[in-house]
């Protein structure tokens, strides 16, 4: 990244995260995306006419109609001149949009960009693969779009991603007790953050139309339902004697997040006040089955590009697709627990897969501001053996 004229974050916004068939069940992914985009633009002080491009992550687009990112832009009230691209990099989609936007800005291709992600896992449809040519006789199979394209390995058929996480947890000799304790602490942090109002500067409320009138959703749904005392009693999720449970896995969720990006020189020229600069970003790829440890490689590469060490970073966000993902990063990189996911992670808050990359950047920036810190680094594991990471610094 050019430090002479760095890419900067002008604003951020995210919706609350709803549970599976929960508070946001009646809201399409594109409407969630539009809500986050509209709020991010309003908070940035940028005239919508200045926005040239929008990138939005969306992993489960079946049934949404053409060009989900374009729909989100138009529904948000952006000019029809805004170019839109929908990005699918599985769980890394929302972060990849920020990386792509940053690269476009650094290259001088555009001046103002929106980057984000959106997902309604609740509304992912079931698919009938044979009906194009006709099922003819007998029974057919309905494929769950959410599971097939979001939660199932593409290289070993019918294997849930959690089975690979369990294998790696076994290799690390992570105990059930350690993972339960991590999930309980993540839930405690999320519940405390909600009680203390820590998420208020991130969240834009979603209006849900119901038969009884509009309902305003302004709080993450799932932490309020969490019961720490129940976590140690849950059955293993992916192996008979396994150590990973539903509580130490991220929950199926709905939500969206968006950020407005530009270059420092443009912000200065137009009287806009940036919040943070993007210092570096990186990606890493390895064996698909080892996706849960891929953030270690991405974080190391990102630190090298930034010229930082682990000790230079004030706060980390490592997406808790499973609790063990953050625990692997803590183990391999020496990240202190009190520096990682300080307001709770996806095991407590939820993981709307196309949105989470943008969501954790949003939460990281807000946490740095709230706690008076300066440098942050966010990373996610990605199905297929990949990971991305991004380093930011408050201005």
Listing of model-derived features with the role each one plays in the protein:
Residues 163-166, 202-204, 279-348:
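Active-site pocket-lining segment
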Residues 14-15, 25-34, 43, 178-269, ...:
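N-terminal extracellular/periplasmic Venus flytrap/periplasmic-binding protein-like
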Residues 1-30, 39, 228-293, 297, ...:
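Condensing-enzyme catalytic core mediating Claisen C-C bond formation in acyl metabolism
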Residues 2-64, 68-72, 76, 80-83, ...:
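Conserved active-site "lid/cap" helical segment
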Residues 87-119, 169-198, 258-265, 330, ...:
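Active-site-proximal alpha-helical scaffold in enzymes
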Residues 58-112, 155-161, 225-251, 332-359, ...:
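Conserved catalytic cysteine-centered active-site region
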Residues 112-168:
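Flexible glycine-/small-residue-enriched beta->alpha junction loops
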């Amino acid at each position: 990244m050019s430090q002479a004229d760095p890419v900067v974050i002008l604003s951020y916004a995210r919706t609350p995260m709803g549970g599976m068939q929960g508070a946001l069940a009646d809201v399409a992914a594109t409407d969630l995306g539009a809500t986050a985009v509209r709020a991010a633009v309003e908070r940035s002080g940028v005239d919508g006419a200045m926005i040239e491009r929008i990138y939005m992550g969306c992993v489960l687009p079946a049934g949404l109609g053409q060009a989900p990112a374009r729909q989100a832009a138009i529904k948000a009230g952006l000019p029809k001149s805004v170019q839109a691209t929908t990005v699918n990099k599985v769980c890394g989609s929302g972060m990849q949009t920020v990386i792509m936007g940053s690269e476009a800005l650094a290259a001088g291709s555009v001046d103002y960009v929106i980057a984000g992600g959106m997902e309604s896992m609740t509304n992912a449809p079931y698919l009938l693969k044979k009906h194009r040519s006709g099922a003819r006789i007998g029974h057919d199979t309905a494929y769950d779009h959410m599971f097939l394209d979001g939660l199932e390995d593409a290289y070993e058929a019918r294997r849930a991603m959690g089975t690979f996480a369990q294998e790696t947890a076994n290799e690390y000799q992570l105990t059930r007790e350690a993972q339960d304790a991590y999930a309980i602490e993540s839930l405690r942090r999320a519940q405390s953050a909600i009680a203390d109002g820590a998420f208020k500067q991130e969240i834009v409320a979603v209006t849900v139309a119901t038969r009884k009138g509009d309902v305003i959703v302004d709080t993450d749904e799932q932490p309020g339902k969490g019961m720490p005392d129940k976590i140690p009693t849950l059955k293993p999720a992916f192996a008979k004697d396994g150590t990973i449970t539903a509580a130490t896995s991220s929950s199926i969720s709905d939500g969206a997040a968006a950020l407005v990006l530009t270059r420092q020189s443009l912000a200065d020229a137009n009287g806009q006040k940036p919040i943070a600069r993007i210092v570096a970003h990186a990606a890493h790829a390895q064996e698909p089955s080892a996706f849960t440890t891929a953030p270690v490689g991405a974080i190391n590469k990102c630190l090298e590009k930034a010229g930082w060490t682990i000790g230079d970073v004030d706060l980390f966000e490592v997406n808790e697709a499973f609790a063990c993902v953050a625990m692997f990063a803590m183990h391999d990189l020496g990240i202190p627990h009190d520096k990682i996911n300080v307001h709770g992670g996806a095991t407590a808050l939820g993981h709307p897969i196309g949105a989470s990359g943008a969501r954790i950047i949003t939460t990281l920036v807000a946490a740095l501001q709230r706690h008076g810190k300066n440098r942050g680094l966010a990373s996610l594991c990605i199905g297929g053996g990949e990971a991305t990471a991004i380093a930011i610094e408050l201005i």
